[in-house]
Amino acid sequence: MELKLLNENGQEGAVVNASDVVFGRDYNEALIHQVVIAYQANARQGNRAQKDREQVKHTTKKPWRQKGTGRARAGMSSSPLWRGGGRIFPNSPEENFSHKVNKKMHRAGLCSIFSQLAREGRLSVVEDIILEAPKTKLLADKFKTMGLDSVLIITDTVDENLYLASRNLPHVAIVEPRYADPLSLIYFKKVLVTKAAVAQIEELLS
């Protein structure tokens, strides 16, 4: 598979030969969907909570007598039928949202995403991205020259200047190959991969 190599002006020049095993896979929508859903589910904190009728702080006094009033019988104001009462099936922090995806499936899903990005022209290779100083303006000007506004940068090692300069830019993220997740790969409009990172990705996913 040939990947486009961009220069500092965002123009396509030479090409980089990449592994077909990683960047030449067929598009598998069902597998990608499963991998993304599992990633989102496993990222949930699971801290939502509601109260049932036992946990709601209400008096247990019977609101009115059982018979003779003409009203519906009622036992206590914490009943789920009442406003301010407890929930019948409340959400609990103990709920388990985790989804298990085998390593082989996870790798295949990432390969399918990388391959589709390459086919759509959303994945490009750069020699390296180096900044002389940790200045956001320097990086913003570089992206403007290259015509980028939403970009995920995958680099073999995260340069400190590059990391500090990118923190205040919206829709920009920098990760190492081992931390590239399926959701970010799909979310960003453009994915830039350094030459050294391409080799690392092939080693991780082959």
UniProtKB/Swiss-Prot annotation:
GO cellular-component term (any): ribosome
Function, as annotated: One of the primary rRNA binding proteins, this protein initially binds near the 5'-end of the 23S rRNA. It is important during the early stages of 50S assembly. It makes multiple contacts with different domains of the 23S rRNA in the assembled 50S subunit and ribosome.
InterPro entries in the cross-refs: Ribosomal_uL4, Ribosomal_uL4-like, Ribosomal_uL4_dom_sf
Subunit structure: Part of the 50S ribosomal subunit.
Region (Disordered), start-end ranges: 46-78
Alphabetical GO biological process terms: translation
GO molecular function: rRNA binding; structural constituent of ribosome
Tagged with keyword Transmembrane: no
Pfam families, alphabetized: Ribosomal_L4 (PF00573)
Keywords for this protein: Ribonucleoprotein, Ribosomal protein, RNA-binding, rRNA-binding
Entry's family note: Belongs to the universal ribosomal protein uL4 family.
Composition skew (Basic residues), residue ranges: 58-70
Name the UniProt record assigns to this protein: Large ribosomal subunit protein uL4
Database matches in SUPFAM superfamilies: Ribosomal protein L4
Domain of life, source organism: Bacteria
